[in-house]
Amino acid sequence: MRVVLDTCILKLATFPAGNNASALIFELARTGLIEAWVSPAILEEYADVLGDHPELVAEIVESFSVCYPLTELSVIRHEPDNRFLECLAASAEFIVTVNTAPGHFDRKHYQAVSVARPGEFLNVPGVGRLVKKLLRG
């Protein structure tokens, strides 16, 4: 399963309550149970926002796949969010975000990609099995 994780998911994953949905999703990506994709522009945003967690940025660089978008999009009012849509070239199935307010990822689908909040993503068929596998270690 290919996903693009909005920066807010990674920021939420750093919160002390490490069993939150965002932390589980990051662990699924970090361990390769789901395939997370980023572009160089997204990596730059991750590094800016997660600057106080350099170890997390290093794990992302090591475990996420990089796509190189061929086109620049401008379909979302909040311009930086367009970088995440540009990763559609990686054939991602989901963009996981908490930013579903107007001007951000306010539609449920962009082309063939579904937009899901963390709790919704964990309820996608097959993801629960991956979480159980992760927790069994």
Label each region the model flagged.
Residues V4-L5, F15-A17, A21-L50:
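PIN/NYN-family metal-dependent endoribonuclease catalytic core
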Residues T7, P40, V98-T100:
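Short secondary-structure boundary segments
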Residues K11-L12:
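Conserved N-terminal substructure of TIR/SEFIR domains
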Residues L43-A58, G126-R136:
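Extended, non-globular alpha-helical segments
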Residues S65-K108:
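Active-site neighborhoods of divalent-metal-dependent phosphate/nucleic-acid chemistry enzymes
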Residues H78, N82, A101-G137:
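Acidic, PIN/NYN-like endoribonuclease modules and their adjacent C-terminal/linker elements
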